[in-house]
Each structure stands twice: as structure tokens, then as C-alpha cells.
Regions:
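Short, structured beta-strand/loop micro-motifs enriched in basic residues and often containing a Trp
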Residues: 70-78
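Bacterial N-terminal signal peptides that target proteins for export
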Residues: 1-9
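OB-fold/S1-family single-stranded nucleic acid-binding modules
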Residues: 99-123
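Conserved hydrophobic positions within beta-strands
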Residues: 36-40
Length: 131
């Protein structure tokens, strides 16, 4: 019986840690929306989150590489994304929310290509703001 209780306690603890890791509000600030234009330097097609890296040139002329968290590969595929959609050099307009820690990191809600095509890129977290 104590083995079952220990197992249950461990599962509850780990579930809480997993939820905290994937919580939008723990990592991103819904009061800090960002919109930026940049060129893709890399796309990591992975689960549980994909990552797009883009170079953004600021008003001061300095280029900063932003790390942009998306939904996972399976979710992106269901939304119409394909790996070949984002080769290096592709220009994108990205909308999302900045990381709470102030780094050039954001959770992406959508991207728009220069031809006007728009794709939803957000994670499926229920606590992420809806646009």
C-alpha cells in the first residue's frame, strides 16, 4: 500500500512540474505583445515546441537574433506548415509575446510571409492569449 502511495505522490509532483514548464504565463508576458520583421536564420522542427530564429534589425541599426517558440512539429503540420516553408533568408512578420526575462525570445501567435500568407504558429496552451 505504501508503494502505491509513494508512486501516486511522485506522479502528482511530476505532473505539477510538467505543467509549470509548459505554462505560457510562467515564461511569457501577455502584456508585452511584440511584432517584428526579420529574416529566418534557422528553423528547428521539433516537439514539444518548434523554434524559429530570425535576425531583426532595430531602429539603432543593430541586428538581434530572436528565438521564437512555436507549437510542436505535429501541431504546425496540422495547421498547414511544412519544413520547407522557412528556408534561411525568408522574410517574416512575426506577432507574439515577449519572454518575461527580457531576452530576445517570444512565443509566436502567427507569422505572415511577404506574399501575405499567414500561418498560426502558437502553442496549444490554453492560457496563451487569443488574438
Amino acid at each position: 500500500m505504501t508503494g502505491i502511495l509513494r508512486t501516486a505522490a511522485c506522479m502528482l509532483l511530476l505532473a505539477g512540474l510538467a505543467y509549470g514548464h509548459h505554462s505560457f504565463t510562467a515564461e511569457f508576458d501577455e502584456h508585452k505583445p511584440v511584432k517584428m520583421t526579420g529574416k529566418v536564420t534557422e528553423m528547428k522542427w521539433s516537439n514539444p515546441h518548434g523554434w524559429i530564429y530570425i535576425d531583426v534589425t532595430g531602429p539603432d541599426g543593430k541586428t538581434v537574433n530572436w528565438a521564437l517558440e512555436t507549437g510542436g512539429a505535429n501541431a504546425l503540420y496540422r495547421r498547414g506548415w511544412r519544413k520547407e516553408d522557412l528556408p534561411a533568408g525568408t522574410v517574416l512578420v512575426v506577432e507574439g509575446w515577449q519572454a518575461r526575462n527580457g531576452t530576445p525570445t517570444a512565443n509566436v501567435s502567427s507569422i505572415t510571409f511577404t506574399n501575405g500568407k499567414r500561418l498560426f504558429a502558437g502553442s496549444s496552451n490554453s492560457d496563451a492569449p487569443q488574438q
